[in-house]
């Protein structure tokens, strides 16, 4: 099997101090820990910012999903700058627009609506991975 299809790398934004950034991270945890633990690998954006060679190698070998909390799309931009191939570029705001009843509040700890929004986002990404055949083997956090 081609190693690029063994698992998908998931890179959430690190929007510290922002509710949508917290939703991004929570959705990534939901996806990697609960929904697709055998088909995803979480990678911290900070490793790419620091130029970590193992992180860059991981991106070069596997397709990537980015989850961004704001319109700056830092996770997506950094993955592309680091040589990665983004197969799904998700913006928390786009998911929120479809689910306005799930308004996230809180930073260190999301409210119930924020957690539900993260779950909805994670489920959408999981379905996308299933459709592309990217949620097969391997799971861990980097």
Residue ranges and their predicted role:
Residues 66-67:
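Redox-cofactor binding/interface segments in oxidoreductases and associated redox assembly factors
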Residues 70:
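Short, polar loop motifs at secondary-structure junctions
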């Amino acid at each position: 099997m081609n190693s690029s299809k063994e698992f998908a790398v998931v890179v959430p934004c690190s929007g510290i101090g922002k509710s949508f950034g917290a939703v991004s991270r929570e959705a990534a945890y939901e996806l990697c820990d609960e929904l697709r633990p055998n088909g995803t690998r979480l990678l911290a954006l900070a490793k790419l910012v620091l130029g970590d060679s193992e992180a860059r190698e991981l991106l070069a070998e596997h397709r990537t999903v980015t989850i961004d909390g704001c319109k700056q799309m830092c996770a997506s931009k950094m993955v592309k700058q680091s040589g990665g191939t983004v197969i799904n570029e998700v913006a928390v705001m786009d998911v929120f627009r479809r689910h306005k009843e799930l308004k996230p509040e809180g930073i260190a700890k999301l409210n119930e609506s924020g957690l539900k929004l993260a779950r909805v986002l994670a489920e959408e990404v999981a379905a996308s991975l299933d459709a592309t055949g990217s949620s097969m083997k391997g799971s861990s956090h980097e």
